[in-house]
């Protein structure tokens, strides 16, 4: 390990340190503590490529780390190298003609969404953890509540810059709606959770920002009636943006914790339904629902 640390320090200089910050040894839950021998804080794709190449040649374990919001210990190292890619956080200009934007893997989802929405655009994937990085979203094919209408991360990745374990930098995909030339390796990488290499950049599809969004709480006297309502909602001309099912047992826990009563206390189940679109379309949808 001493030989490897010297090699990687010679290559990457002060971007290489020992692991003093305990956040690199755990995940967001903090229940499991790992161990690591060295930390690389990459700032460019070349840094990532150099670190991966040296680790591969010297048979060193690697854990890739973005925002560290993972809840299942997959970012907990078991010795070797922690490669922090959170500094690859450049947000490019919006390509309005192709309706896309290029971002670094370290860009936080919330920062991307705030940026594009301030320009009148919309990036739909909406997993629960908004502080997660785009690289993490791609590696896990994150979805979220809006997947009901808009799909998951995979549906919004046009192009990927990807570094293999051997340190080769590859590009997959194209900034087009349809690309049927060759093997679709982009989709092999998406959802692979870092097992095939490291995503360093991505060009993401955007859509125009919906003009109006509204949610409603619908109460039901039984769980069965709530579930039976779902086909009707999905058959509507304006598809729901998100649907969340909540049963009375869960509500009771929240009421006890917050010391507040939920609306319609006699209900056994609830659907929280969100629609987006033009204001009139959304209002019409709620009238039908």
Give the role of each language-model region.
Residues 1-289:
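Noncatalytic alpha-helical scaffold of FAD-dependent oxidoreductases
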């Amino acid at each position: 390990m001493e030989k490897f640390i010297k090699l990687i320090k010679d290559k990457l200089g002060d971007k290489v340190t020992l692991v003093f910050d305990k956040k690199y040894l755990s995940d967001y839950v903090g229940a499991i503590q790992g161990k690591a021998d060295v930390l690389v804080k990459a700032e460019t794709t070349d840094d990532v490529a150099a670190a991966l190449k040296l680790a591969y040649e010297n048979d060193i374990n690697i854990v890739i780390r973005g925002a560290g919001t993972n809840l299942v210990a997959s970012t907990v190292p078991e010795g070797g190298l922690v490669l922090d890619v959170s500094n690859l956080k450049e947000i490019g200009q919006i390509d309005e003609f192709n309706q896309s934007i290029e971002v670094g893997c370290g860009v936080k989802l919330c920062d991307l969404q705030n940026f594009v929405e301030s320009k009148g655009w919309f990036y739909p994937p909406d997993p629960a953890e908004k502080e997660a990085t785009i690289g993490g979203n791609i590696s896990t094919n994150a979805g979220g509540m809006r997947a009901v209408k808009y799909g998951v991360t995979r549906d919004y990745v046009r192009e990927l810059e990807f570094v293999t374990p051997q340190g080769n930098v590859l590009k997959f995909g194209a900034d087009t709606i349809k690309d049927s030339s060759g093997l679709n390796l982009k989709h092999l990488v998406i959802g692979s959770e870092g097992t095939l290499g490291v995503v360093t950049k991505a060009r993401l599809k955007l859509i125009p920002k919906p003009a109006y969004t509204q949610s409603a709480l619908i109460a039901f006297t039984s769980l069965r009636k709530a579930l039976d309502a779902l086909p009707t909602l999905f058959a509507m001309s304006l598809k729901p943006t998100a649907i969340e099912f909540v049963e009375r047992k869960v509500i009771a826990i929240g009421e006890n914790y917050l010391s507040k009563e939920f609306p319609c206390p006699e209900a056994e189940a609830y659907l929280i339904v969100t629609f987006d679109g033009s204001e009139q379309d959304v209002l019409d949808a709620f009238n039908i629902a």
